[in-house]
Structures are given as structure tokens and as C-alpha cells.
Amino acid sequence: MAASIRSVIAMINPQFKSFIDQEILPQTNLGVEKFWQDFSFLINEFSPQNRKLLEHRAYLQKQIDAWHISNRSRPIDMGNYTKFLEDIGYIVPEGLHFKIETTNVDSEVATIAGPQLVVPLKNARFALNAANARWGSLYDALYGSNVVPETDSLKAGAGYNPLRGQEVINYGRQLLDQSVPLANGSHRDVISYKIHRQALLVTLADNSQTTLSNSSYLVAFTGDEDSPSAVLLKHNGLHIEVLINREGAIGKTDLAGVNDIVLEAATTTIMDCEDSVAAVDADDKIEVYRNWLGLMCGTLSVEFPRNGKTVSRRLNPDKIYTAINGGDYQSAGRSLLFNRNVGLLMESSMMTDADGKPVPEHIIDGVLTALVSMIDLNRRLNDGSGYNNSKAGSIYIVKPKMHGPKEVSFVCQLFDAIEKMLGLAPNTMKLGIM
């Protein structure tokens, strides 16, 4: 194990300290000495509280184990069992009803209902794939899955199967008819899409013209109004992008020149430091934090071989269109990223507290997640690069395996202290309770 060095009153793994001092702190307005002093004070304030909570967990578990042993030969009476759990304090009285108002919450949390992914943050390639899963080809997803049945004539096979491809196209048109229907006719019979007087002008195979049944479905486009390369539609808060290219592999055989339909998909992603990750030492954990740093800075990239070629992965930029009423229409190119810290149980040898005991790892996770995310918040205000995570100015942390309101209250107090330590506005850190 690497030798540790002393900073104020906590012992710190030197590689971990060097990573923070050299790669993270220079991108913030925090001084090295002050940061480590405040970090040490925070550890020594919250580590003992964390241990007491875990001792209470152990006490409860011991009581529960004893109850099950003593009642192993009897059928479980749920009424008696519930009363027992209430008596020992495992089930606590329900609190009073309350209302809260949370500010600076991104639309992906507040108003958009969309899929959420969970990926191990230690794997940069998986993390990038998930972050970029905000948008995905419907055609690719259908062709490569059993949503389109693989009957004899529709098998995918080694090469392109045009019969299967046509079933994919039919499915796509059906989705358009369901989500963004026309005033008359079907998207299946469209031969051209144009933008005319801030509306979608649609020509059908019989040369009749129609438009969308609801004009609000159309929000933006790219290319010329008479021959757009993309038409951006919106249904229930989620975008549908119809890509038009009459020279494309699919578009050249399509009546309307539609080359693909791209759906807004994973609106949020949990970058996981917990269950899906095997981070057992300082080197592993530094890799996890370094990937989070790359995501928050917009610089994370990875290269890997595929079919004899080198493939690169990096974060997708935001998507820019022409709004129907003029000007730019910008849509997020990436999932809104949450960070799932470890739970209260885990300890880390990267740091020790004033008593020489390993520090609860979730405290380190909380500080490092917020510290790195500060870079994203500062870039949001200053550089306009388009790679911001939270456009509302928040940090989203999922805290797993919490046992009851006392532990939730403890984490809220910890987040308050982290915000104060880092100079963040109160409630910048948003807590996801698991």
C-alpha cells in the first residue's frame, strides 16, 4: 500500500491527493491548503456520526435476526411482526405532510418523463455511450432487435435484408402516425416534407397536401425550408427527428427521402460509483473520479479497436436547429448526468480521520462529486462551450441504501456542509433518495 501523508488532521493517500491538487483544484477557485483543511474538518465532524448510525443499523439487525430465530417454527403473523418492528424503532411513525419548492431543477428532472440508464462510472466507454444515449436511431434499434420478428423472410443475416428494412420503415411510420399524426392521411404515404409559413407542409402520394393535426408538434428544422435535411417534432416533451436524405442508403428508396428517424431517448443517466462498480483501492477510485472529471469538463474520450479499425468515442455536442419562428433552437445532445455515490456502510483507506479510522467512502464521494461538478457549473456561466451537464446550475447525487429518516437527515446535513465548504449556494446539491 502506498505510504500516506498528513494534511492537517487526516491521513491522505498521496496519489489521491496529487490527483486533486494537480487535476481538479486548478480548475476551481479553491486554494489547496484551505481545501484540505476544510475537508479534514468535515471528515472529523461527520465520520463519528456515520459510525453511530451504522451502530444503530447493527442493533436493529441483531434484534430482527433474533426475532426470526425465535419464531422460525411459527407462521409469520404480519400484525405482530409489524408491531415488533415498530417497538424496536425499525418502523418509525409517519411524519406530518409537507410541501417543498425546489429551485434550479433541470427540465429532465422537473418536467420530462423519459428513460434513465445506469452505468459503471469506472468504464469510460460505457459512460460515454450512456451519456450519448440521449438520442438514438429508431431504425438501428428496430433492425437489430426482435421488436421486428425474425421470421424466415425477415432475418437480419450477415448483410442488409431489404424486407426486414421495410418492416422497420413501416414501424417508424406507424410511430409517427401515433405520436405526431397528420390532419389527413398517413405518414406512410408522404412523398415530401417542407416548411411553409411556420408549419409543416406535407405532400401525399396522391399529390394532396396536408399538415400536422397539431401545429405545436413542429418545433424546428435544419436545411432549407423547401428541402429540409431534418424536421424536428415534439410529443409529450420528447423530440422526434426525421432525417431526410434522398441520396442516403435508406432515403434513396424511401418515398419521402426519409433516411432515419432519431428519437430522444435516455434523458437522464446515473453514473454509478456503487453497485455496478468494482473500485477496491485508491487507484480504482481515482479512475472513477477522473472519468467524472472528464464528463463534467466535456473532455472524456476513449479509443478502442473494432473490425480492424480504431473507433473513437467522445461526448456529443448539443444539437442546433432553426426554430420555426426564426433564430436557433438548441436541444441537449447528452443525458443529464447524476452521480450515484456509495452508501453509508462502505469505508475507504484513501483517508483516515483524527482517530486513525478509515473514512466513510460516501463522504469522500460527496465532496469529490460536488468539487468536480463545480467545474461544470462555472463553465455554464463562463465559456459557452455547449458541453454543460446541468443547465439549471445543480448537482444531482443519488444516495443509495439509506435506512430511515435519520440517515436521510444526516446526508442532508452533510450536503449542507459540503456546499458551505466549497462555496456553493445552498441546495445546489440535489439528493436522490434510495
Put a short name on every predicted segment.
Residues A2-P75, G79-V92:
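N-terminal-proximal low-complexity accessory segments that begin disordered
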Residues A2, T82-K83, D87-F410, D416-A425, ...:
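Catalytic alpha/beta active-site cores
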